[in-house]
C-alpha cells in the first residue's frame, strides 16, 4: 500500500505572498495559513456530505503536494494590452507578471511569452509545460484576428521558435508552406503524464486538451487510484469519462481489464496513441483495454453486472442518467466497488446519494489539494457494495 502520510503532513502555518492580492480573482485565500485552508475544505466537503445524508469515514483527509507553485498549465486572457486574470472587483483583466500558482518552468514560459506585442484587443491563451519541459501554446482569437495573425507571420515565427503552437477551438496547427502559414489538423504530442505505480506513462494529447493542472499533484491522484483498484481481485473495470487516459493507466496497473468510455474523439485518439506507444515491456497491457465512444451521461448500453468495479470521473454536471441501469440490477449483480473522482463536490454528493441507495458505502475519501489558495479541490472516494 502506498504511503500517503507524507502528503498528509504539511506546514499548517505557511502563507503564500502575492503582489496582486487582493485584486486578482485567481486565488481566494492568499495570505491565509495553509492549515486553515485545508481545514476549510474539509469543513466544506463534510457539510455537503452531511446535508445530503451521505455516510463518510471520519476524519476526512487532505493530501497536498504543497501550498504553491504546482501548476504546469495556465489559462489567461488578453484585454487592451493587459495579460492576466480577471480582477475581483470588476470584469477587467489584471496584468500579471508573476504568479505563485505556477511551477518554475511555467513561470519562465510566461515571462518569455509576455515579451510578445499583440496587435489585438482581446484573446485567450493557454500556456503549458510538458513532462520533459517542452513548451506549448494554445491561442484562441476571433476568426478575423486569427487571419491577421497568420498573415502577419512574424509573431507566429517567433512563437514557434519557443513552443509548439495550436490555434482556435479546433486546435489547428499553423504550418509554414514556404510563403504563408496554413492551419493543419490537430496533432497529438506528449503534454501530460500518467503513472502505473512508479512507472511514468506518456499521454498524447493537445495543448488545449483537458488535463489535471499539475504533474506533481497528478502523481498523488494516480497512486490513490492504483492503490484502490489493486485491492480487489479479478477486476473487470468500466471507466466513464476516460479522457486521454490519465486514470486509465493507474487502473490498468491493477485491473484485469478496462473498458474506457469517452465521448470526445480527439481524447480517445490520444488514449489509443498512448497505449500503442507503451514500452515493449508493457505493450501487452494495451490488449486489456477496450475503447468505447458514447455519451455515457445520456444512455448506457453496457451491462453493469459484467464488471467488478466502476471508475468514474464525470464533468461538473455529475453522472446524471448513467446510474439508472445500476438501480435495475439485483444487489448481488452490482459491481463490488465504485471509485468516484470529482472537482465539483456538489454534483458528487448528489450522485453519492444514488449510490448509497444502491447499497454502496464510502470506505475511504481523500481531498487532493491540487488547487491551493483557492476554493477548489479534487475529491476521490472509494465505495464498496454491502454484502447481502
From Swiss-Prot:
CDD domains associated with the record: AdoMet_MTases
Taxonomic lineage from the root: Bacteria, Pseudomonadati, Bdellovibrionota, Bdellovibrionia, Bdellovibrionales
Top EC class for this record: transferase
InterPro entries the record matches: MeTrfase_TrmA_AS, MeTrfase_TrmA_CS, rRNA_Ade_Mease_Trfase_CS, SAM-dependent_MTases_sf, U5_MeTrfase_fam
GO term, biological process aspect, one: rRNA base methylation
GO MF entries: 4 iron, 4 sulfur cluster binding; metal ion binding; rRNA (adenine-N6,N6-)-dimethyltransferase activity; rRNA (uridine-C5-)-methyltransferase activity
Matching Pfam families: tRNA_U5-meth_tr
PROSITE patterns tied to this protein: RRNA_A_DIMETH (PS01131), SAM_MT_RNA_M5U (PS51687), TRMA_1 (PS01230), TRMA_2 (PS01231)
UniProt name for this protein: Uncharacterized RNA methyltransferase Bd2056
Catalytic residues (positions): 343
Keyword tags: 4Fe-4S, Iron, Iron-sulfur, Metal-binding, Methyltransferase, S-adenosyl-L-methionine, Transferase
Record-stated family: Belongs to the class I-like SAM-binding methyltransferase superfamily. RNA M5U methyltransferase family.
SUPFAM superfamilies xref list: S-adenosyl-L-methionine-dependent methyltransferases
Binding site for [4Fe-4S] cluster: 18, 24, 27, 99
Annotated EC: 2.1.1.-
Positions contributing to S-adenosyl-L-methionine binding: 212, 262, 313
Amino acid at each position: 500500500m502506498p504511503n500517503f502520510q507524507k502528503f498528509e503532513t504539511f506546514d499548517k502555518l505557511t502563507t503564500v505572498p502575492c503582489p496582486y492580492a487582493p485584486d486578482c480573482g485567481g486565488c481566494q485565500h492568499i495570505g491565509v495559513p495553509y492549515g486553515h485552508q485545508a481545514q476549510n475544505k474539509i469543513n466544506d466537503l463534510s457539510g455537503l456530505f452531511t446535508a445530503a445524508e451521505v455516510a463518510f469515514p471520519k476524519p476526512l483527509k487532505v493530501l497536498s503536494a504543497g501550498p504553491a507553485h504546482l501548476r504546469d498549465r495556465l489559462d489567461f486572457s488578453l484585454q487592451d494590452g493587459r495579460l492576466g486574470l480577471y480582477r475581483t472587483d470588476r470584469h477587467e483583466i489584471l496584468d500579471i507578471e508573476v504568479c505563485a500558482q505556477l511551477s518554475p518552468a511555467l513561470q519562465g514560459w510566461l515571462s518569455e511569452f509576455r515579451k510578445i506585442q499583440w496587435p489585438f484587443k482581446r484573446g485567450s491563451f493557454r500556456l503549458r509545460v510538458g513532462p520533459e519541459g517542452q513548451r506549448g501554446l494554445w491561442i484562441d482569437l476571433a476568426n478575423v484576428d486569427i487571419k491577421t495573425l497568420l498573415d502577419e507571420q512574424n509573431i507566429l515565427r517567433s512563437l514557434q521558435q519557443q513552443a509548439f503552437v495550436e490555434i482556435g477551438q479546433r486546435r489547428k496547427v499553423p504550418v509554414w508552406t514556404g510563403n504563408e502559414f496554413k492551419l493543419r489538423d490537430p496533432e497529438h504530442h506528449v503534454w501530460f503524464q500518467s503513472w502505473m505505480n512508479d512507472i511514468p506513462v506518456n499521454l498524447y494529447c493537445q495543448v488545449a486538451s483537458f488535463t489535471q493542472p499539475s504533474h506533481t499533484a497528478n502523481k498523488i491522484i494516480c497512486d490513490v487510484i492504483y492503490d484502490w483498484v489493486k485491492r480487489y481481485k479479478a477486476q473487470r473495470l468500466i471507466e466513464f469519462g476516460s479522457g486521454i487516459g490519465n486514470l486509465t493507466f493507474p487502473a490498468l496497473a491493477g485491473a484485469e481489464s478496462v473498458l474506457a468510455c469517452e465521448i470526445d474523439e480527439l481524447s480517445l485518439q490520444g488514449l489509443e496513441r498512448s497505449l500503442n506507444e507503451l514500452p515493449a515491456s508493457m505493450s501487452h497491457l494495451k490488449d486489456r483495454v477496450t475503447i468505447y465512444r458514447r455519451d455515457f451521461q445520456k444512455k448506457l448500453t453496457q451491462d453493469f453486472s459484467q464488471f467488478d468495479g466502476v471508475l468514474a470521473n464525470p464533468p461538473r454536471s455529475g453522472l446524471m442518467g448513467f446510474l439508472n441501469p445500476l438501480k435495475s440490477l439485483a444487489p448481488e449483480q452490482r459491481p463490488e466497488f465504485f471509485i468516484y473522482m470529482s472537482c465539483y463536490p456538489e454534483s458528487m454528493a448528489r450522485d453519492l446519494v444514488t449510490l448509497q441507495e444502491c447499497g454502496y458505502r464510502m470506505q475511504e475519501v481523500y481531498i487532493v489539494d491540487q488547487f491551493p489558495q483557492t476554493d477548489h479541490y479534487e475529491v476521490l472516494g472509494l465505495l464498496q457494495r454491502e454484502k447481502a
